[in-house]
């Protein structure tokens, strides 16, 4: 049977819980990063990660370093030619990576990406876009970042983009 649990202020269906809406079991009622500035999304410290988890984080850091060096703020990089590709000129890779950076505890990289979103990301352009890619990567990336952090910046950007995509 399906029932509901509250997750960050929203309800989600949970097939494993049979409390039929009696919501005494909050999964996570945090509202984003803790008041003391720590990232409550990532509760593990690096010393608690397994060797395989650390390898994945290292690989992601390696990829992010290449993205930063060869195409930061661009839609995609071309790792072989060490150049970038501008598909829609809206930082697809950067925005699509926000949740990954958060979940992996890559706080410095996340802050850098967030700063780019705040200061550079602008949808006031006359550009054809692929609706599917723009929706899943850009809109989805902004909404994921908002869901994880509750930072209004991401919701405002998502709302702006969503309104622009709506006529399509």
Q: Each predicted region: which residue ranges?
A:
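Glycan-recognition and catalytic cores of secretory/periplasmic carbohydrate-active enzymes
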Residues: 1-17, 22-168
């Amino acid at each position: 049977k399906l029932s509901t649990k509250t997750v960050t202020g929203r309800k989600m269906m949970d097939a494993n819980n049979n409390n039929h809406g009696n919501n005494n079991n909050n999964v996570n009622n945090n509202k984003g990063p803790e008041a003391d500035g720590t990232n409550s999304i990532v509760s593990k410290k690096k010393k608690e990660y397994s060797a395989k988890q650390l390898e994945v984080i290292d690989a992601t850091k390696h990829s992010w370093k290449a993205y930063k060096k060869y195409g930061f703020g661009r839609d995609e990089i071309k790792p072989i030619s060490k150049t970038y590709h501008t598909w829609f000129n809206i930082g697809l890779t950067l925005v699509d990576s926000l949740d990954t950076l958060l979940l992996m505890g890559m706080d410095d990289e996340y802050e850098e990406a967030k700063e780019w979103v705040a200061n550079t990301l602008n949808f006031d352009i006359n550009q054809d876009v692929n609706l599917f890619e723009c929706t899943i990567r850009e809109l989805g990336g902004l909404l994921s970042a908002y869901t994880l952090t509750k930072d209004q910046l991401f919701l405002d950007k998502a709302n702006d983009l969503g309104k622009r995509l709506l006529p399509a």
